[in-house]
Amino acid sequence: MLDLKLLRDRPEQVRQALQNRRATVDLDGILQLDRERRQLETRKGSLQAESNSLGKKVGEIIRQGADPQGPEVAALRQRGVDLKAEIAQLEQQERELEEEIRARLLTLPNLPLPSVPVGRDEADNVEVRRWGEELKPAHPVLPHDEIAEKLGLLEIGRAVKVAQSRFVAMVGAGAALERALIAMMLERHIAAGYTEVIPPFLVNSAALQGTGQLPKFAEDSFRCADDDLWLIPTAEVPLTNLYRDEMIPAESLPLYFCAYTPCFRREAGSYGRDTKGLIRLHQFQKVELVKVTRPDQSEAEHEKLVQDAEAILQMLELPYRVVELCSGDLGFAAARCFDLEVWFPSQNQYREISSCSNCWDFQARRANLRYKEAGQKGTQFVHTLNGSGLAVGRSLAALLENHQQPDGSIRIPKALRPFLSSRFLSEDGILIPAA
């Protein structure tokens, strides 16, 4: 959530930043509501001061000899009753205005940092670096879904029968391979200082509001309406909200969390895109990284977060590139974001496999997540960061294509082999699909 004081003090700067994001918002409407609220606050303060003085005045005139039951005292007491009623009415109006202002603020996206390149969409994103060589073999590379079905690693038709389209079932060596990827990712991140968490896979509306999925993206989430619970779209939601409405001692920061969870998304608006394979599913597995930091730490921690995600791709020997998102392509809560895109030889293109975002204090304001310096008065909002480390299905898909051999077999990267049962691994590191 944006700081209302920032909107009030620098409206044109905010307006330009939102325009760079291609966000259409009614800033003037929010500022008008804020003016009305402050006018009510001023009026209420004046009435409260008068009410306080009335009590003293009644005592004074009685001490001076006025009849406590007389008309003069009665008039003052009636004025006191009227003031309390008017103050109560103003307080109700003030609460209603505050609720409306907050509701509108919750619809505003985060502001891009000044360093973010200005652009309209993904075509204006800026490539930062590449790692590894793009696989362009002389032999044809089967798409990941075709080679996976051919090797018996996944069931699509039967999963659709059980659920609906955009669901798959990993079986046999496919399930073992996915489990190995998860274990490798978690072990690497834990070794880098992250604390593993197994969070709830269902969260309440307040949690989704805290990280920015609500109210804007309700249609893209699965909801259990009877319980006000939602299936998580990413572990970012429960991890970031672990400390919601809390004050963290400054000496405890930064906090690092990692979690493996299934993730659930309706994929609203993606009709006709990536209808086959593991790229765009309603349910998918992901290892998520979340950091909670002091403001002066967040930019350096952002760079380290990207490197942590890159480390997994390097362990899997997958060629990738790092891209900085332009202002028009930023996610709702991000102030700055780097995407990691992995090479898919069957498509002859890079595809996103991780988004690493610095959300600045945007989520912290929504979730009331603060920290306190020892010996200092007051508290400040933390900065929150998150990134995929990595999306498991897309990692598996990229592995099946980039390590596909001319005979159609799959070479398992050396770093992954210790996590895969020997039943599924030949002596020379080739996947045994039917063990």
From Swiss-Prot:
Enzyme class: ligase
Substrates-to-products reaction catalysed: tRNA(Ser) + L-serine + ATP = L-seryl-tRNA(Ser) + AMP + diphosphate + H(+); tRNA(Sec) + L-serine + ATP = L-seryl-tRNA(Sec) + AMP + diphosphate + H(+)
Any Pfam family matching the protein: tRNA-synt_2b
Pathway: Aminoacyl-tRNA biosynthesis; selenocysteinyl-tRNA(Sec) biosynthesis; L-seryl-tRNA(Sec) from L-serine and tRNA(Sec): step 1/1
InterPro entries, alphabetized: aa-tRNA-synt_IIb (IPR002314), aa-tRNA-synth_II (IPR006195), aa-tRNA-synth_II/BPL/LPL (IPR045864), Ser-tRNA-ligase_type_1 (IPR002317), Ser-tRNA-synth_1_N (IPR015866), SerRS_1_N_sf (IPR042103), SerRS_core (IPR033729), tRNA-bd_arm (IPR010978)
GO biological process: selenocysteine biosynthetic process; seryl-tRNA aminoacylation
Keyword field: Aminoacyl-tRNA synthetase, ATP-binding, Cytoplasm, Ligase, Nucleotide-binding, Protein biosynthesis
Enzyme nomenclature, EC number: 6.1.1.11
Cellular component, GO, one term: cytoplasm
Residues involved in L-serine binding: 234-236, 288, 388
Molecular function via GO: ATP binding; serine-tRNA ligase activity
CDD domains the UniProt entry points to: SerRS_core
Residues that bind ATP: 265-267, 352-355
Task performed by this protein: Catalyzes the attachment of serine to tRNA(Ser). Is also able to aminoacylate tRNA(Sec) with serine, to form the misacylated tRNA L-seryl-tRNA(Sec), which will be further converted into selenocysteinyl-tRNA(Sec).
Quaternary structure note: Homodimer. The tRNA molecule binds across the dimer.
PANTHER family linked: SERINE--TRNA LIGASE, SERYL-TRNA SYNTHETASE
Name of the protein in question: Serine--tRNA ligase
Gene source species: Synechococcus sp. (strain JA-2-3B'a(2-13)) (Cyanobacteria bacterium Yellowstone B-Prime)
Species lineage: Bacteria, Bacillati, Cyanobacteriota, Cyanophyceae, Synechococcales
Gene: serS
